[in-house]
Amino acid sequence: MDLKQYVTIVPDYPKEGVQFKDITTLMDKGDVYRYATDQIVEYAKEKQIDLVVGPEARGFIIGCPVAYALGVGFAPVRKEGKLPREVIKVDYGLEYGKDVLTIHKDAIKPGQRVLITDDLLATGGTIEATIKLVEELGGVVAGIAFLIELSYLDGRNKLEDYDILTLMKY
């Protein structure tokens, strides 16, 4: 199935010059959303995943149905101040400054095989920070899965030590 036909390109959003890839027009078609999820599930089965981890918010949209299909748990990575219990955190760079990502300190057990999911691989900064959180807790990043990769932003270069699945490339 050609998933690109279900992604809407929104010009000049959120700012001029950006061609935003809107996945809601993929998700609102149950058979297409299921197909995309199933592709990631098949990839994850080969990796013997114990836990799925995804950064907010679209990492949840991808990761939760994958975790459900695999029969494993899901651990959210959130911005600072959004998780209620003790967390670990990591600072990461954005094009306009810095931000902080957190995960519950007890979310991952040492040695657990983790699949990281997100909707889009752009510069790789968010996923690089997510990897640091997973590894700090002793998790093993067994794979990383994205719906979309923006190849021209070279985010994959930051993640060259990891196995990556992308369902669409632009």
Swiss-Prot record:
Known partners and oligomeric status: Homodimer.
Pathway membership: Purine metabolism; AMP biosynthesis via salvage pathway; AMP from adenine: step 1/1
GO biological process, alphabetically ordered: adenine salvage; AMP salvage; purine ribonucleoside salvage
HAMAP family for this protein: Aden_phosphoribosyltr
Cellular compartment(s): Cytoplasm
Domain of life (superkingdom): Bacteria
Enzyme Commission identifier(s): 2.4.2.7
Similarity section: Belongs to the purine/pyrimidine phosphoribosyltransferase family.
Gene Ontology CC: one annotated term: cytoplasm
SUPFAM superfamilies given in the database record: PRTase-like
Taxon lineage: Bacteria, Bacillati, Bacillota, Bacilli, Bacillales
InterPro entries: Ade_phspho_trans, PRibTrfase_dom, PRTase-like, UPRTase/APRTase
Alphabetized GO MF terms: adenine phosphoribosyltransferase activity
CDD domains named among the record's database cross-references: PRTases_typeI (cd06223)
Function according to Swiss-Prot or TrEMBL: Catalyzes a salvage reaction resulting in the formation of AMP, that is energically less costly than de novo synthesis.
Enzyme class, first EC level, given as a word: transferase
Keyword tags: Cytoplasm, Glycosyltransferase, Purine salvage, Transferase
Primary location recorded for the protein, binned into one broad class: cytoplasm
Catalytic reactions of this protein: AMP + diphosphate = 5-phospho-alpha-D-ribose 1-diphosphate + adenine
Name used for this protein in its record: Adenine phosphoribosyltransferase
